[in-house]
Amino acid sequence: MPTMPLLLAALAALAVLALAARPSPSCSPGPDPSGKCQRLVYTHSATCVDLHLRTCADAAYNHTSFPTPLEHRSWEAVESSPEYMLLGVIHFLLEGQCNPDLRLLGCSVLAPRCEGGHTQRPCRHVCEGLREACQPAFDAIDMAWPYFLDCAQYFAPEEEGCYDPLEELRGELDVEEALPSGLPPTFIRFAHHSYAQMVRVLKRTAARCSQVAKTYSIGRSFEGKDLVVIEFSSRPGQHELMEPEVKLIGNIHGNEVAGREVLIYLAQYLCSEYLLGNPRIQRLLNTTRIHLLPSMNPDGYEVAAAEGAGYNGWTSGRQNAQNLDLNRNFPDLTSEYYRLASTRGVRTDHIPISQYYWWGKVAPETKAIMKWIQTIPFVLSASLHGGDLVVSYPFDFSKNPHEKKMFSPTPDEKMFKLLARAYADVHPMMMDRSENRCGGNFLKRGSIINGADWYSFTGGMSDFNYLHTNCFEITVELGCVKFPPEEALYGLWQQNKEPLLNFLEMVHRGIKGMVTDKYGKPVKNARILVKGIRHDVTTAPDGDYWRLLPPGSHIVIAQAPGYSKVMKRVTIPLRMKKAGRVDFILHPLATGPKNFLPGPSRALPRFQDPQREPTQMDFEPPRARRQPASGSKPWWWAYFTSLSPYKPRWLLKY
């Protein structure tokens, strides 16, 4: 579900621009109560001007013309129009579905393509195909299809001459990408992929395996590139009860490209093997929801790719376009954890974000990741890097801030070591004693290390995952060369294929279950405690939970305000292919709420985040919001209240 503060802020800023420019209405609504524009303006001859719209920066053309089909006659008129504002927030409203396709389709109307002194219309069949695919997403939030994406009015048939506005995004195979005939269906092209090529491969893969895969965007980079994710699940696009969620992230540093390519290959492999009936892959996709983000830093990658492969790109492109190191840009919750851990009776998990964090420079890529992990109940994660050959795990920040190297374990040290070993133990190069190692030689440690014991730093993504959410994340250094040459990519994939699959299967280690009241109603945000491990997980909105646990006997407790706590003993075997099912039924207290350990937000009110991205726990399931009450507006209408008098009433169904 989209976040109200973020969208209101964005729309408020755009509304200020509208008031300052005070343009005339972009079109006359006419007598139609829907507020649709009644006149179309498409000229065959026009004066082409450079395209200067941030939302349309990645369009497949560089020139447009005025007036536009919606009668906009200046950049100010376009940028202050409700149509343009919708394109800026549609990603959030639809939770990443159909983007960037939908945004680029809208750009083709708001800023028509102009070449050689002539405007060109987008193709009708492209619009019709996208509408068919995306209409369910609009229906899910009770939003009408935007009038300016009317396929019959604003788009041209092929016989009249038109262009595909999505060609650069998901177009046909390039000549150099075309696969030779006779190749097996598992063929993967082991080469570096540009941003456009990466998106095309992911979208083609999702289309090929549409029953178990889909793509979506979690946000945009500083330069406007969508952060595209491909997910695999038996029901893609939705969380299934008690199905664990796992994510793999590559290219957080733009010049560390091995993880980017490996995840692109993994997506194709999962799709192909599923279609071929591979029982291991089918079991994995039918019991797990897997999210792959090959490139968290596409802007930095472009800088590194321009310099080329090899050691010469050791630092070029590491940061994002704002010159920020994204793996140092997350809130420093580890320092707060060390402070809390010294106090008995205070929770040290789900630590809120300090308001001071937002006073600094926070990258849009970082914000996108934070919103993502606050929205989806991830259980397990790995961040893929390059430059060494080792698997590290939290904490990454030393418990003594003056020590650059100091063993600093989490309460889940045993589990994190198991996760790290699940990757390293089946990686042939990490276990090869004859291999010349790069950087530090971690073979004596089993090619795993506590992050702070390697080198200490703050603002890392792994520590943030663990201390702010239920998610356990490790960091994998895939090899010595950050930007390997193409001839090394096949070997890189072969070395990491089995470790990746083995790691994904680790999400099923431990226990899972439901927490309900005596009537069977789910208890959301209930706490799952394990005696001897000072780190709790919480239930999702539907009452389901997952708790990664090492082998052994554990006392597990479920509790929630207003209910009596329930305690159970569980035994985790050395080997297990699926998590043990442990349900809890909580009974209400007869004498009022019991005193529980205070959470960090109650113990530390100064750490409440004024710009906090709401988590999934803050929202009812989307199906509960689908139908507005009689006479009321849909929940998303509040996002557009700042646009008076030009509210987009054409988005209302009622």
Curated annotation (Swiss-Prot):
Disulfide bonds join C48-C114, C56-C107, C98-C134, C123-C162, C127-C151. Residues 43-165 form the FZ domain. Residues 191-507 form the Peptidase M14 domain. Its EC number is 3.4.17.-. Glycans are attached at N62, N286. Inhibited by 2-mercaptomethyl-3-guanidinoethylthiopropanoic acid (MGTA) and guanidinoethylmercaptosuccinic acid (GEMSA). Inhibited by chelating agents such as EDTA and EGTA. This is Carboxypeptidase Z. It comes from Mus musculus (Mouse).
